[in-house]
């Protein structure tokens, strides 16, 4: 109606607009109208996020995977074997939309160079998305086409499945490296609402459909390709890689050399305490950025390698922000206080929120979001879909609404409960950076150096004394030798 139109018009008022709607009384907006105004203002949310994402980087940039491809690109994999950075790159490339480019067969394939060229052509022609960041993805694909290290890698066995009924989002691709091994890459969460729902299902399900398919896919690869295997993935893909490594058959597990988990969530306590986890845990290599908020979810038993990222907060999950020096990641010794705070909060929340209530709350939220026609998360912020979501939220039954509200109440309580520990860690971190604390550390270091020097001096003095004593005893023995002979 005209009333709604003027309520939702965020453009600058013009004389024509004022005259056109002058006859409409301007009453204060209701709460519903106010919510509509706020949500409509966010209707172009995905573009706002993209603009914000571009600014969410610190100035202390170092080389990332793009620079690595150019720097290391002249050395084929048969000369310099696959490293951790290569594994991150191949894991990230699994997000590319290889549909109609790479087939699901294992006896045929397409080179990474040809696949990259087709992806760029389709993106240019149809303006379709690539992985997550079109501008950076285009640069990466162009560099891969010229890289002797990556361009001849063969892509085989591509599968991509999104099943709203089963609440499953699963995709995987296998790379034939050309140096006698194959890399099985599992895709992480994409932009689909179903994909995000499956992620949340992990908090109360022992096994989700994507995990079952990951096991089946890895075993299928092992039967189709007679090569040693490396499995890996980024985000949920890392979780799928670890799960596949645990629950494949013994013959397949014996052929898996390494499992890469790049900032992927962990598992419930029953899974990480299982016998299957113990069979593969020494082969799992988990990498997280210093402010990780995704990779620290759920429970882990394997050690972390902390990677320096120039992203801010949750945007450190983006593989393009991970910093590289030469052929390896820039590694840090400790995660930030924000990451520890998120970790403590989520774990406390999951302990307080029983599995049945988790299921009810998550199913309720998903039912509301599914009321729209949007398949992707970004679609939810379109005007027509937003109104559908609001209507569904208003029609939510009392039991489901109570479960959702209780979940958010417990989340708030968990956040408050984690504040003291966060403040303590923050204060300790800040104190360590203070000038007087640094001088104190320098004094401690100097004292340690002096103590070591004194210890060395004492050791040398004792050694000399022992040498003199031994020499004196030998001289005395020589003097007494004639007497002893007599």
Q: Model-predicted segments: where are they?
A:
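Alpha/beta hydrolase fold serine-hydrolase catalytic domain that processes acyl esters and thioesters
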Residues: 60-85, 90-172, 177-182, 186-201, ...
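Short hydrophobic alpha-helical segments enriched in small aliphatic residues
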Residues: 11, 22-24, 48
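Short glycine-enriched nucleophile-adjacent loop
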Residues: 241-250
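Extreme N-terminal basic, low-complexity initiation segments
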Residues: 2-9
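Gly/Ala-rich beta-loop-alpha elbow adjacent to hydrolase catalytic centers
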Residues: 233-237, 241
């Amino acid at each position: 109606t005209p009333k709604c139109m003027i309520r939702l018009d965020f453009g600058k008022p013009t004389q024509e607009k004022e005259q056109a709607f002058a006859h409409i009384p301007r009453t204060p907006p209701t709460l519903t109208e106010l919510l509509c105004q706020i949500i409509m203002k966010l209707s172009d949310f995905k573009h706002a996020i993209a603009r914000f994402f571009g600014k969410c980087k610190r100035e202390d940039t170092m080389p990332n995977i793009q620079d690595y491809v150019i720097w290391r690109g002249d050395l084929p994999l048969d000369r310099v074997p696959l490293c951790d950075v290569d594994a991150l790159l191949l894991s990230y490339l699994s997000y590319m939309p290889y549909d109609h480019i790479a087939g699901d067969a294992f006896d045929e394939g397409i080179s990474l160079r040809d696949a990259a060229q087709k992806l760029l052509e389709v993106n240019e022609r149809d303006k379709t998305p690539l992985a997550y960041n079109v501008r950076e993805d285009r640069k990466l694909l162009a560099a891969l086409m010229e890289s002797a290290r990556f361009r001849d890698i063969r892509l085989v066995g591509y599968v991509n499945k999104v099943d709203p009924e089963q609440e499953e989002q699963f995709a995987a691709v296998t790379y034939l490296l050309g140096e006698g091994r194959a890399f099985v890459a599992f895709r992480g969460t994409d932009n689909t609402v179903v994909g995000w729902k499956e992620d949340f299902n992990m908090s109360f399900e022992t096994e989700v459909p994507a995990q079952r398919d990951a096991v089946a896919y890895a075993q299928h690869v092992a039967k189709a390709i007679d090569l040693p295997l490396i499995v890996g993935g980024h985000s949920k893909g890392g979780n799928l890689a670890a799960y596949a490594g645990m629950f494949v058959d013994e013959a397949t597990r014996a052929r898996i050399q390494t499992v890469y988990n790049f900032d992927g969530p962990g598992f419930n306590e029953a899974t990480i305490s299982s016998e299957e986890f113990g069979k593969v845990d020494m082969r799992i290599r988990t990498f997280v950025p210093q402010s990780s908020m995704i990779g620290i979810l759920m429970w882990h038993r394997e050690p972390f390698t902390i990677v320096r990222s120039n992203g801010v907060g949750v945007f450190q999950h983006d593989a393009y922000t991970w910093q590289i020096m030469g052929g390896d990641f820039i590694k840090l010794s400790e995660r930030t206080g924000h990451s520890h705070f998120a970790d403590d909060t989520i774990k406390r929340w999951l302990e307080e929120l029983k599995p049945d209530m988790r299921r009810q709350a998550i199913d309720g939220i998903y039912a509301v979001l599914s009321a729209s026609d949007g398949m992707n998360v970004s679609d939810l912020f379109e005007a027509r879909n937003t109104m559908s979501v609001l209507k569904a939220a208003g029609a939510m039954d009392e039991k489901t609404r109570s479960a959702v509200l209780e979940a958010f109440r417990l989340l708030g309580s968990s956040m408050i409960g984690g504040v003291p520990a966060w403040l303590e860690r923050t204060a300790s971190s800040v104190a360590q950076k203070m000038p007087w604390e640094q001088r104190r550390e320098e004094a401690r270091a100097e004292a340690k150096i002096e103590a070591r020097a004194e210890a060395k001096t004492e050791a040398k003095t004792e050694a000399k004394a022992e040498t003199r004593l031994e020499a004196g005893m030998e001289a005395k023995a020589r003097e007494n030798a004639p007497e002893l002979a007599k």
